């Protein structure tokens, strides 16, 4: 379960300063390595990425179950929790929680440099 404002599945965004890997790419790396099954994974509260207009497409291409912030607000917590329980089932869960998934009015000091 991935709680974040960004997908972290970027495959076409260049790495920074010549880095070999990046925190913006880990979802793609793990799926490519078979370490994560995107069809059994949730990405929740995604809000966007300023570098590309098709920011959700890599997640969809990999098969991740995506709930954007807009969708989260529309559907409500109970419905998203129900979907998450269905998708994950009784399998072990790893939760990655990036503070930028919180609304900026709640966590105004959080940024992504």
Cite the ranges covered by each PLM segment.
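Conserved alpha-helical scaffold segments that buttress catalytic/binding sites
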Residues: 1-113
């Amino acid at each position: 379960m991935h709680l974040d404002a960004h997908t972290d599945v970027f495959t076409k965004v260049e790495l920074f300063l010549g880095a070999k890997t990046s925190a913006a790419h880990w979802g793609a790396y793990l799926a490519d390595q078979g370490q994560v099954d995107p069809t059994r994974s949730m990405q929740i509260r995604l809000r966007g990425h300023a570098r590309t207009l098709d920011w959700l497409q890599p997640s969809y291409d990999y098969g991740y179950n995506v709930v954007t912030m807009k969708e989260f607000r529309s559907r409500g917590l109970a419905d998203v929790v129900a979907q998450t329980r269905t998708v994950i089932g009784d399998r072990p869960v790893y939760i990655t929680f990036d503070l930028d998934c919180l609304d900026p009015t709640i966590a105004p000091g959080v940024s992504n440099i």
